[in-house]
Amino acid sequence: MSRIGKMPIKVPPGVTVDIKGNDVTVKGPKGTLNRTFRPEVTITRDGDYLVVAPVGTDKAARSFFGLSRTLLDNMIVGVKDGFDKNLEIVGVGMRADKDGNNIIFKVGYSHTVTVAPPAGITLSVDGTTKVKVSGINKEEVSQMAAEIRSIRKPDHYMGKGIRYAGEYVRIKPGKAIGKGAK
């Protein structure tokens, strides 16, 4: 049994949860999220708590048990507080500029790269080297941050590129000039 899945989820004040079979709708101050869960799990309400339980003891039910509990918890946290992912741009001349809802990246290519956020995602620029991705759906926020990072991944020789805030990039040593070099 999943240790994470066994823990009940507390529903905070200001958040309403509507359960209809495997369809769950969570409404809060930041917005509304809806998800259809797998038939291998059941979700029930017990006072101010939500309880996720597997249907049966087969491998599929056990594997979706903890996942479903975490997804439901992320929905509740998202509509209450929201999620943020911060990115940093490292490198001489590399920058990001805001243009309406879009962000224009100048990251060492011969052209600029324009990123338009999908619905429900907000992009903001702090200074010219910090980008913040925010929204209520953790999966969409993380996916958007990963797409932005993939524009110019950090270089392992110089460390230049777009990285997550606090991400450690291991710098490789360059070519060593040895004894036989002429």
Curated annotation (Swiss-Prot):
Signal peptide: none annotated. This is Large ribosomal subunit protein uL6. Belongs to the universal ribosomal protein uL6 family. Part of the 50S ribosomal subunit. The keyword Ribosomal protein applies. Keywords: Ribonucleoprotein, Ribosomal protein, RNA-binding, rRNA-binding. InterPro entries: Ribosomal_uL6-like, Ribosomal_uL6-like_a/b-dom_sf, Ribosomal_uL6_a/b-dom, Ribosomal_uL6_bac-type. Disulfide bonds: none annotated. One of its GO terms (biological process) is cytoplasmic translation. This protein binds to the 23S rRNA, and is important in its secondary structure. It is located near the subunit interface in the base of the L7/L12 stalk, and near the tRNA binding site of the peptidyltransferase center. PANTHER family: 60S/50S RIBOSOMAL PROTEIN L6/L9, LARGE RIBOSOMAL SUBUNIT PROTEIN UL6M. One of its GO terms (cellular component) is cytosolic large ribosomal subunit. GO terms for molecular function: rRNA binding; structural constituent of ribosome.
